[in-house]
Amino acid sequence: MKPYTLISVDGHAGLPTAQYRDYLERKHHAAFDEELEQLALLRKGFLTAGKNAKQTPLMYQAHMHRYSDPGNGEMQERIRGAWDLDVRLRELDAEGVIGEVLFPDGQGFNSFPFGGFFGEHPVPIRDPELRAAGARAHNRWLAEFCAASGGRLQGVAMIMPFDIWQAVADVRWAYAAGLRGIVLPPPDETYPPYHEAVFDPLWAVCAELGMAVHSHGGDPPKIYGQNIASQTLAILELGFFRRRILAQLMFGGVFVRHPNLRFVYTEVGIDWLPNFIELLEHVYHNDWLRMGRAPKQWLSLSPKDAWARNCAAAATAATFDEIQQARRLGFDTVMWGADYPHVEGGWPHSWDEIRQAFATVGDDDRRKMVGENAARFYRFDPQLIESLVAKIGPPAGTFVSDEAPQRPEFSVHDFTNGWVNTYGGFARNMRWSLDSPDTHPDSRPNAKRDS
């Protein structure tokens, strides 16, 4: 049999924040300088907290200190792929990954101007004009970065929805620049909910151009205060605010009005989705709120049908139990993500993760989820895929194993890591990425090693 087509639909890219200056409109440079001063102070405090952290809720800072510390030379060289194309392609080759879909970054202090991580900023910036300008600066750089990859990287533009007609123009620009989707911030109080008609021009242009709309995991809202439990609660609810989008789109009739619109969940887990869709389906068929009319009387597309026709999800840091739930979603709607270069993803042990998570899935369905669905969904060049698969694709049988799948074990330590949510791969993968090479050696056949 032929080698596997391995495409990650969850990668991250972004310049070190200061280097965005050349991509930012000049009129915003003064505000940008102020932001850089604030971020420098934030980083200093963040790294100090990481050095001092014990087995406390600050354990997350301790891990992230190792990831972000300029003195950690080996890690810093590997994560340079967030903005260094040569390093990135080398890491992809080592994993046998032929293509990636790229979202904004922020873990390595490389957030885009005024935007933080997916539009949520550690230094509160409420000015819509600044946040949108920063997103456009990132999109300009991302288009250049992807264009230089020879078709291996597909970029997703960050779109801020404050001015809907500016957002429409930004989508058209992104498409013309070669980007292949958009990502929106989670719903918040600064703009209407996504089911409101004001967003119809945005959905229309995305459907017209085939630009998939994404909701990606990111920072939770800044509503948790300064209590010792605040960070744990924030991470515990990380995906909650993203889940609201699906209900808004489905019950708001967005997929009825825009039947060609495509929507993708990325890095918010998939194990919760089947039950959530079942709940939406129940509400659709019943007068759940005792209002005298069930939604099916005024909405022609059921949630299950909308999911099958319009939606997909990426399994990032996938676990065995999570992929079992993919059966209920439909294997044609599930894709895989490595999350390079983030510490909580599968990189640099993607083969081990896939072998475990997809252990009981038939090989045809496994091939769909780890690459073939993504190749079709994001319109990768078939000839490019064929040539790269022949060169670096994981050999047939690589992900077939007789070993019993390992379920992640949660513990108090995992809570203090700050990465507890509905999918348990995060705690395992953070240890993979941050432990010493002696503990978790690089076993990738394609990896280049020092002689």
PLM feature segments, named:
Residues 149, 178, 208-209, 257-261, ...:
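Structured helix-beta-strand junction loops
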Residues 19-33, 113-123, 167, 171, ...:
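Aromatic- and acidic-residue-enriched segments that line the glycan-binding/catalytic groove
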Residues 213, 217-220, 251-253, 259-308:
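Aromatic-lined glycan-binding groove of carbohydrate-active enzymes
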Residues 10-15:
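Short polar catalytic/cofactor-binding loops
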Residues 2-5, 16-71, 76-79, 84-99, ...:
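Mid-to-C-terminal alpha-helical segments outside catalytic/metal-binding sites
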Residues 7-9, 100-102, 154-157, 182-184, ...:
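Hydrophobic faces of well-ordered beta-strands that scaffold small-molecule active sites
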Residues 66-79, 83-87, 91, 95-245, ...:
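Active-site gating/metal-coordination segments in enzymes
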